[in-house]
């Protein structure tokens, strides 16, 4: 993305603040015009006092300097008031819009598909959000407070200086042109280098976040020194990339200071020569020296602005790239909110591919009646999770239709559809908030009595009441203050509060010990009552009483039936069942043999 296009996008993000932005632009134009009145009046006052008539006619000739001085005071007061007003409103605009864009970005990334979040480090997304919005704030604030006025000053100065004395004006702009060319070369030189710097910043953030997210692993394997050394290595690469950029911008500082001195001396030299020929006045020479000083200052501001924009460009580009990421699915313009559904689910010849080449799901058809339990079985990558993802519209199928209560899910609003579907994940997902707040994710307006009832039905009330703070107990980051079984029972209580007609159990007990699994299964039996339930399972013992079992292989359903029917068919499912049960029988036999062979002690 070009720098100009990037900056256009930055201005587009002003949103509702555009009207204020235009008002500030007009105020900056007036400010830029008024600022040049001071050197003009200064020069005219000198001419009047020295009796040397000016060659220009910008100000009517007068023998008294007092009217000119009064005008100078008036323009000075106007400039002060206008500058203060612009600065105040520019500050407010930048702060308000930073918060608005931050909220918009946060809402946007929460709506992006899980595949995006799987492939993007959460630490990077946080860095992009915070650094991107801070960069927007700095650019907006600097632009409307001073940089836009500086740019307009250059536009105003050209015709004004040509009108007063075209000879001095040509010299002034020739010298400033050289300054601009040299600065532009430095800007182009450092643009790619700064992109490399920001890439190193992203690596640094991701590595630090990765280590902090696995701090238990780092400590248990005594990897603290190694991780610190790894971070130091990335930081050294960052510093190595940053130093050349800083050197080039130090050169810009030298060019700026040299340009100021050379320009003032050149104008004085030419002005003296012209004055000796009667082609300019002393006041005009002083006026153009003031112009030169003012122009160099404005060019410095413009260069500073371009410099800051160059420094911020990688952050802004990264921010806008995430902001431009398109959700895999969206609400159709004519989508409807279905209200509460009964739970009749139909897959009709559904096919889906992630890459457009190998099908993840192919010609899948089945019907789940309200209240039935449908189990999905198969090896990893067989298509179970993909089928469920199509149900709650993480993706849309390339062909076929997924229906609920006879309605194509693509015709329903996302919020309306997902309000009717509850999910109990394999790893219970909890916020770093109180237990009550985590449960109210399922039902924000739930009363305390409803929380207790849901926790009781989910076999969670006992451990909640054991805590001194009860429902106000903080779950910790990702629920780490609780055990795996406690987290899972809270997840089930949350689903009970949501009370959806359709429930998805994604390996809900696979990571639990036998005792905890028994408690969780009691809670699951409670939450499954009266709901259409889909169970993704590797432990076949957990789906013994499923209404129907679908056996997946390479995106297709190769077997379908009840547990007993599938075992009787002696197919793939029967092999899985025998393998799992044989492992359990062999384990029990080994324990029994060890017990029999052990010596008896009296």
Swiss-Prot record:
ATP binds at residues 378-385. It is a multi-pass membrane protein. Its EC number is 7.5.2.3. The chain crosses the membrane at residues 22-42, 68-88, 146-166, 167-187, 254-274, 276-296. It catalyses: [(1->2)-beta-D-glucosyl](n)(in) + ATP + H2O = [(1->2)-beta-D-glucosyl](n)(out) + ADP + phosphate + H(+). GO terms for cellular component: plasma membrane. SMART domains: AAA. One of its GO terms (molecular function) is ABC-type oligopeptide transporter activity. It comes from the Bacteria. Residues 21-311 form the ABC transmembrane type-1 domain. PROSITE patterns: ABC_TM1F (PS50929), ABC_TRANSPORTER_1 (PS00211), ABC_TRANSPORTER_2 (PS50893), NDVA (PS51317). SUPFAM superfamilies: ABC transporter transmembrane region (SSF90123), P-loop containing nucleoside triphosphate hydrolases (SSF52540). Gene3D superfamilies: ABC transporter type 1, transmembrane domain, P-loop containing nucleotide triphosphate hydrolases. It is found in: Cell inner membrane. Belongs to the ABC transporter superfamily. Beta-(1-->2)glucan exporter (TC 3.A.1.108.1) family. PANTHER family: ATP-BINDING CASSETTE SUB-FAMILY B MEMBER 10, MITOCHONDRIAL, ATP-DEPENDENT PERMEASE MDL1, MITOCHONDRIAL. Homodimer. Involved in beta-(1-->2)glucan export. Transmembrane domains (TMD) form a pore in the inner membrane and the ATP-binding domain (NBD) is responsible for energy generation. This is Beta-(1-->2)glucan export ATP-binding/permease protein NdvA. It comes from Rhodopseudomonas palustris (strain BisB5). The lineage of its organism: Bacteria, Pseudomonadati, Pseudomonadota, Alphaproteobacteria, Hyphomicrobiales.
């Amino acid at each position: 993305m070009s720098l100009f296009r990037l900056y256009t996008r930055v201005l587009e993000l002003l949103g509702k603040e555009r009207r204020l932005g235009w008002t500030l632009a007009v105020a900056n134009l007036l400010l830029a015009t008024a600022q040049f009145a001071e050197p003009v009046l200064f020069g005219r006052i000198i001419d009047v006092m020295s009796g040397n008539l000016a060659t220009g006619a910008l100000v009517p000739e007068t023998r008294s300097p007092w009217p000119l001085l009064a005008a100078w005071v008036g323009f000075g007061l106007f400039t002060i008031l206008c500058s203060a007003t612009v600065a105040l409103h520019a500050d407010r605009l930048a702060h308000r819009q930073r918060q608005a864009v931050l909220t918009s970005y946060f809402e946007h990334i929460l709506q992006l598909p899980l595949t995006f979040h799987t492939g993007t480090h959460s630490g990077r997304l946080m860095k992009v959000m915070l650094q991107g919005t801070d960069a927007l704030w700095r650019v907006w604030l600097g632009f409307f407070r001073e940089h836009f006025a500086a740019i307009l000053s250059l536009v105003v100065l050209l015709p004004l200086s040509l009108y007063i004395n075209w000879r001095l004006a040509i010299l002034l702009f020739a010298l400033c042109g050289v300054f601009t060319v040299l600065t532009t070369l430095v800007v182009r030189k450092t643009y790619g280098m700064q992109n490399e710097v920001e890439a190193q910043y992203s690596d640094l953030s991701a590595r630090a976040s990765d280590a902090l997210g696995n701090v238990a692993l780092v400590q248990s394997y005594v990897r603290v020194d190694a991780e610190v050394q790894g971070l130091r290595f990335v930081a050294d690469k960052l510093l190595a990339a940053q130093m050349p950029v800083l050197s080039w911008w130090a050169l810009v500082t030298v060019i700026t200071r040299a340009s100021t001195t050379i320009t003032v001396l050149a104008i004085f030299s030419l002005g003296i020569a012209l004055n000796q020929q009667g082609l300019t006045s002393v006041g005009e020479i002083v006026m153009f020296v003031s112009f030169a000083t003012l122009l160099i200052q404005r060019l410095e501001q413009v260069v500073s602005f371009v410099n800051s924009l160059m420094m911020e460009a990688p952050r802004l580009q990264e921010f806008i790239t995430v902001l431009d990421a398109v959700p895999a699915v969206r609400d159709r313009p004519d989508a409807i909110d279905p209200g509460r559904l009964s739970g009749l689910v139909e897959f009709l010849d559904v096919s889906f591919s992630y890459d457009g080449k190998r099908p993840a799901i192919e010609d899948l058809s089945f019907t789940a009646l309200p209240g039935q339990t449908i189990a999905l079985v198969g090896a990893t990558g067989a298509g179970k999770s993909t089928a469920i993802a199509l149900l709650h519209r993480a993706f849309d199928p390339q062909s076929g239709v997924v229906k609920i209560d006879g309605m194509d899910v693509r015709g329903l609003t996302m919020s309306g559809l997902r309000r009717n579907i509850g999910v109990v994940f394999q790893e219970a997902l909890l916020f770093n908030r109180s237990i009550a707040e985590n449960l109210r994710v399922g039902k924000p307006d739930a009363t305390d009595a409803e929380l207790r009832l849901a926790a009781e039905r989910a076999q969670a009330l006992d451990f909640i009441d054991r805590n001194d703070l009860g429902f106000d107990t903080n779950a910790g980051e990702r629920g780490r203050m609780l055990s795996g079984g406690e987290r899972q029972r809270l997840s089930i209580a949350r689903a009970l509060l949501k009370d959806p007609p359709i429930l998805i159990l994604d390996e809900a007990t696979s990571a639990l010990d036998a005792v905890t699994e028994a408690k969780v299964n009691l809670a699951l039996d409670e939450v499954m009552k009266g709901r259409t339930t889909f169970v993704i399972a590797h432990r076949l013992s957990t789906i013994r009483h499923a209404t129907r079992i679908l056996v997946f292989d390479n995106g297709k359903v190769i077997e379908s039936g009840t547990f007993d029917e599938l075992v009787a068919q002696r197919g793939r499912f029967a092999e899985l069942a025998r393998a799992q049960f044989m492992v359990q029988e062999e384990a029990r036999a080994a324990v029994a043999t060890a017990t029999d062979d052990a010596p008896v002690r009296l």
